[in-house]
Curated annotation (Swiss-Prot):
The keyword Transferase applies. GO terms for molecular function: methionyl-tRNA formyltransferase activity. Attaches a formyl group to the free amino group of methionyl-tRNA(fMet). The formyl group appears to play a dual role in the initiator identity of N-formylmethionyl-tRNA by promoting its recognition by IF2 and preventing the misappropriation of this tRNA by the elongation apparatus. This is Methionyl-tRNA formyltransferase. (6S)-5,6,7,8-tetrahydrofolate binds at residues 106-109. Belongs to the Fmt family.
Length: 303
């Protein structure tokens, strides 16, 4: 089976490498154009491109997929297209040239869109998974070939769930390809969406419900980290690991700090958080920050 692989970030590159290690014939890779990264704004290859070059797979990075993509398919004649976090919607006529299947990090039709892992955590879902579906003209609405479920822990972070779904996704992709063609099932159930993350999403408000605060912190841990004001400066918080109900203290107040973390009051309770990061400094425990005279009990985060 001749595979055309479309993907861009790390999540996609792991899937591509797993295909190669399992002996699949990837005839070409299409990835987004290279972009400047880091403080020096140096142009760096996408993670998928790096893997493709490692295995001597032809790489294409068209700005307009419909124009250049048609030539790629005409010349290489792939049997199937696999899409993992490519970064753009596929549209006709390119979409109609062969069957394209997408590996999506949610249980469709729930959480269609760009940020399913973060939105699952924000909403406190107890289960999520991987869906492999045939791409249609709508956003993540095509018929399903394969679904795999996993449980989501109460304090599981974005980083932890990302790794879990990454492992599940690459194995599901191999299973799908080994059994292709698979009978497709239309998507059924309640549709929900997972829009792209904005700066507003990263703002933490301790005046909200304690469960909301807990889920907000873990949804962006370890990257990019939720933001909250402390003494008129933006700090980041990570590592929420406990909640207490029915606190009646001042909102955003640091009730206590010990070696485990800081207990911070919310609307109807308090959360225990392990790490804080001040501007221009490394991430540190609250206990380290207290010993360094950067923070103390009784002080408050701005809401």
């Amino acid at each position: 089976m001749r595979i055309l692989f479309l993907g861009t970030p790390d999540f996609a590159s792991v899937h591509l490498e797993f295909l190669m290690k399992n002996g699949f014939d990837v005839v070409a890779v299409i990835s987004q154009p290279d972009k400047p990264k880091g403080r020096g704004k140096k142009i760096l290859p996408t993670p998928v491109k790096e893997v493709a070059l490692k295995y001597n797979i032809p790489v294409f990075q068209p700005k307009k997929l419909n124009k250049e993509g048609l030539k790629i398919i005409e010349n290489l004649k792939p049997d199937i297209g696999i899409v993992v976090a490519y970064g753009k919607l596929l549209k006709p006529p390119f979409l109609n040239t062969l069957e394209f299947y997408n590996v999506h990090a949610s249980l469709l039709p729930s959480y269609r869109g760009a940020a399913p892992i973060q939105r699952v955590l924000e909403n406190g879902e107890k289960r999520t998974g991987i869906t492999i579906f045939k791409i249609g003209e709508g956003m993540d609405d095509g018929p399903i070939a394969l679904k795999k479920e996993v449980e989501v822990g109460e304090f599981e972070t974005f980083g932890e769930l990302y790794e879990k779904l990454l492992d599940l996704g690459k194995k599901a992709l191999i299973e799908f390809l080994n059994n292709y063609p698979i009978e497709l099932i239309p998507q059924e159930g309640k549709v929900s969406f997972a829009p792209k993350i904005t700066k507003e999403d990263l703002k933490l408000d301790f005046s909200k419900d304690v469960t909301f605060v807990k889920n907000k912190i873990r949804a962006y841990d370890p990257l990019p980290g939720v933001r909250v004001l402390f003494k008129r400066k933006i700090v980041k918080l990570f590592g929420v690991f406990s909640v207490l109900e029915n606190s009646s203290r001042e909102i955003g107040k640091i009730i206590s700090i010990d070696k485990e973390g800081a207990l911070i009051s919310c609307e109807n309770g308090s959360v225990k958080v392990r790490y804080i990061q001040f501007p221009g400094k490394r991430k540190m425990t609250f206990f380290e920050a207290k010993n360094g005279c950067l923070i103390k009990e009784g002080e408050c985060f701005d809401c």
